[in-house]
């Protein structure tokens, strides 16, 4: 494993072989080329692995899987569906809050900063970890999907039962890497305004997740968000990939 990779230690141990694979070398080269050509990449380099940093492998209790980062200015910070404090809550997250209200009676937060979930063991993972500014899905097919497949496999191999919330057909592809005899897989349409009314609303995934965790002797997730979120802690230097 390249010692210059900046990654939380439990994930670094589990994912070390991935960084020695040729596809990661190609991905690194692609990202460097993008920046050299003046293209802005979101999130910032130090936040590519933010979801892994905040939720160590042995603490994962729930996985929520997104597609790729927000591509608007100031939005993406390495956690799927989450935005920085002070940034307007995106429509998909508004719908997630609506489902939380219907499911658990939790009033919608006045912000879209989900870091408190991550610190409780909710892995907020995008399938693709970078995007070009203003171009949705622009970094798909460059290697991130293979890397996040490895992330899901690593979670699946943990002894502790985990809940996988897979919203939309893109996220549901990752179910192939999950042992349903040990873990709970919950599927629903994506919370986007285009599909939320097709089955995301009413899915009750949040209460189902907590019921499963409790049944396994694990603490449930407190899905309430702090009224005033702390500022995200920035990593000082970007990872070498």
Curated annotation (Swiss-Prot):
SUPFAM superfamilies: Uracil-DNA glycosylase-like. Disulfide bonds: none annotated. SMART domains: UDG, UreE_C. It is an enzyme of class 3 (hydrolase). GO terms for biological process: base-excision repair, AP site formation via deaminated base removal. Keywords: Cytoplasm, DNA damage, DNA repair, Hydrolase. It comes from the Bacteria. One of its GO terms (molecular function) is uracil DNA N-glycosylase activity. Its main location: cytoplasm. It catalyses: Hydrolyzes single-stranded DNA or mismatched double-stranded DNA and polynucleotides, releasing free uracil. Gene3D superfamilies: Uracil-DNA glycosylase-like domain (3.40.470.10). It is found in: Cytoplasm. Coiled coil: none annotated. GO terms for cellular component: cytoplasm. Excises uracil residues from the DNA which can arise as a result of misincorporation of dUMP residues by DNA polymerase or due to deamination of cytosine. Belongs to the uracil-DNA glycosylase (UDG) superfamily. UNG family. This is Uracil-DNA glycosylase. The gene is ung.
